[in-house]
Amino acid sequence: MELTRRNFVQAAAATAVAASAACTATAVADEAAPAASYSGTDYVDAAAEGKQPTIIDYTNVVEEVGAPDVVEAHDLVVIGAGGTGLAAGIQAFEDGLDVVVLEKKGLAGGTFPGSEGMFAVGSHWQKEAGVEIDVEEIIGRLMTYHHYVPDPELYRTFFNKTAETIDWLEQEGVGFQEVIALGESDPTWHLYAGERSKGLGAQFMVSFIARAEELGLDIRFETPAKQLITDESGAVTGVLAVDSEGKVIEFDAKAVIIGTGGYANNMNMMKQLAEVDPTKICAAGSNGRDGDGIRMARHAGAIMAPAPGTAAWYGPILYGTTYGTPVQVATSLQPVLWVNEHCERFVAEDMFFRNFPCAGMAHKSQKTVYTMLSQKFLDMYEADGVQLQVGVYCEKGIPLTTLKADLQDLIDEGNEHIWVADSVAELAEKAGLDADKLVATVDAYNEMCANGKDTQFDKADEFMIAIDEGPYYLFEVQNGYFCTVGGIKISTKCEALNENRDVIPGLYLGGMDAGGFYGDAYDAGIAAGSCASWAINSGRLAEEAAREFIGK
């Protein structure tokens, strides 16, 4: 594909749209992926046919390709043109390396356009705002939060890079607008510049891609990497890829950096590693995160880091809706009533705002989750806006003027996960739930609302509003997640490690392909924006280490 400024900017805009795919019970795998064992569709296909899928290690399956039709030689090959890959590629180009970036899609950006801001400590934005954060103190809190799964030295390496990376991004043409807290976090979340309604991450990526085009960075679109090449010693010496014409290209290289975005869309890997029912989960962002990089690294001898199944869960999303849209925010994430398959509450319903990974983890512990509200809440949200803000997508005080029309469209389209009734008992019966149990739960909840105190889960008093007048609405919701954060075990230099914990020479990983950065949950309540920040910073850290290894 010819690379022009127009293509780059169109690519970023298209990526923003792609990041808005709605979730359904069946659309949980990358439909564009080949129907083979490495595609991530096996589990869903087998389940649809009432069969058990073959039990194999999906982290170590790669596609075989034939002999190369073309051979090229470069200093560095970067796999993936998302946040991590572009950061590594741009940095490498500026450092004088002969670098090529391989991207399996026809556009750059990956799922990064779905982000809104990134974590940093010690930035000039924080200094100008009078924000002081002790690096060692926050590392201690994170290590405790993650049960000492991560490597504290990896944290130090990352944290000490974040402020300089903010400066670097601004020099590259990427802007920021402010640094704020997210829920209970410290003010570490650096929001990207731009109009919030147009997607801050998309605007970040438009600028970043434009910089890559300005430099003349060599990005090969529609050229997916298939396998790593290793020598007799186990060192990685290149990549086998296939271009859009089906030609096998051997990219010989002195080092390879992998940044393919994790495995959020690979339902085989989600089932194996996260131990979830793929029909009850929903990945936010664009498709294509099929675990390519992890699988290639595993095939080359790398091991998975502890907590390989960790994902950035955030909690409820109504089937058939898109994260951050008015109908999703109003029906799924507001502090109304959340119950499980037994019609029991299981968490304070304002947890999404307080610490959204905890909302997602609580959801993950249930078999099925429903949110419930009444007409007065829909009227309130449409007239006055939501009770809880969701990132920069739906802000408090801004009326959701199309909410009821959007919801009615879903009902008219036959969404089977929405029920409406004039009584709580009838609502339960329509949904196939125990009517007596749901009535008892609602009555107990309304009594707490009347007393102004949630004595069960300590939800904030201001959100204790009774659900006592019909029509009543019940929504079956999936558990949403932004990305997976479990991956390959790496050193503090982002080097891949083998089963002996020795470095695999020439192989580096960043972003969501690199593991060992999280425990069993995302840490937005402490380090808001750490995923996006890790994507960019690890790309640069991997490039630095690879450049040192190459000797340039």
Task: Tell me the role of every PLM-derived stretch.
Residues 72-74, 246-255:
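Core beta-strand elements of the Rossmann-like FAD/NAD(P) dinucleotide-binding domain
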Residues 251, 255-318, 528, 532-541:
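Glycine-rich loop(s) and the adjacent beta-strand/alpha-helix scaffold that form part
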Residues 11-13, 34-58, 63-65, 98, ...:
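Conserved N-terminal/central alpha/beta ligand/cofactor-binding core
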Residues 1-16:
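N-terminal secretory signal peptides and thylakoid transit peptides that target proteins
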Residues 68-82:
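Beta1/beta-strand and adjacent pyrophosphate-binding region of the FAD-binding site
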Residues 437-521, 525:
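A glycine-rich dinucleotide-binding beta-alpha-beta segment and adjacent secondary-structure elements
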Residues 294-296, 303-430:
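An anion/pyrophosphate-binding glycine-rich loop and adjacent beta-alpha core
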Residues 229-250:
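Conserved beta-strand-loop-beta-strand element in the redox core of flavoprotein oxidoreductases
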